[in-house]
Regions:
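Acidic/Ser/Thr-rich, low-complexity mid-to-C-terminal regulatory regions of eukaryotic proteins
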Residues: 172-176
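Short hydrophobic/aromatic patches at helix-to-coil boundaries
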Residues: 257-259
Length: 259
């Protein structure tokens, strides 16, 4: 309960912190510069996701995942807050899963140059979901890292290198492989191809000492397609992720709204 309370309070703090510095763009400036295909371009938005997870132990979770992004006026700072409400077939219970918080600081962007951007990030999972009910991992996860960008016309790639720390699973009744604290790293690159009204991204990820594979290495592949149905305001999309060694799959249908 203390972890859930902390996660909720931290979420509201970040919301209040960034609402004061949220974007203040006119319709003209948004239209001329709006390009959400690049991860280093951040805009205030809410993504509503219907999610289905095929887990390693054969159970399933499904439900709603809200993803709120708040960006500063100059786009150098942004906070991403994910709040999942899922049902577990393992326990037949519905509830809050692990909240995910991400912070990005992008002090440099100049896409005509190589590299076209540089920044720092912090990715955190808060163990707000019940481990015994199959709704959470039961551990804190921290991944501070560096990001950059290379843009080649319609194609762009955004490499990220991050340190990965996963705390010990506190709710585990017995010690099992991978339940101890883990230390490793993540190497990934978000590869994006932009069409006229949509874009497709594919992200290969290598995780050293991964929480997704009992402390062993894992290879992950993510794919995301988004189509702009209302210019600069609304997108529909589909997301898929596969942990190949951790043997789990995530599917999402998304409705994204820009403010």
């Amino acid at each position: 309960m203390e972890v859930k309370t902390f996660g909720i309070l931290l979420t509201f703090f970040l919301l209040n912190r960034f609402s004061a510095s949220a974007q203040d763009s006119t319709t003209t400036s948004i239209t001329s510069r709006f390009d959400p295909s690049k991860p280093t371009n951040t805009y205030d938005r809410l993504s509503n996701n219907l999610e289905y997870n095929f887990l390693r132990n054969g159970s399933r979770t499904f439900g709603y995942r809200g993803n709120l992004v708040l960006a500063s006026h100059d786009q150098r700072n942004s906070v991403h807050i994910e709040i999942p409400l899922l049902y577990s077939t393992f326990s037949q219970k519905f509830g809050l899963s692990d909240i995910r918080l991400r912070y990005y600081w992008i002090p440099y962007k100049h896409y005509s140059r190589k590299p076209g951007a540089f920044g720092l990030l912090l990715d955190t999972y808060v163990p707000t979901g019940s481990f015994k009910d199959g709704l959470g991992r039961g551990r804190w996860i921290f991944a501070p890292g560096l990001s950059t960008a290379f843009v080649f016309g319609r194609f762009s790639t955004f490499p990220i290198v991050a340190y990965l720390y996963s705390s010990e699973i506190k709710d585990a009744k017995t010690s099992s492989p991978g339940s101890e604290a883990l230390s490793g790293y993540i190497i990934q690159s978000i590869c994006v191809y932009k069409f006229r009204k949509s874009y497709l991204d594919c992200t290969p990820i290598f995780m050293k000492n991964s929480y997704s594979n009992s402390g062993k290495d894992d290879f992950v592949l993510e794919g995301n397609y988004l189509y702009m149905i209302k210019p600069n305001k609304m997108q529909l999309g589909f997301f898929a992720r596969r942990y190949f060694l951790g043997n789990s799959t995530t599917l999402r249908a998304a409705w994204r709204i820009y403010f």
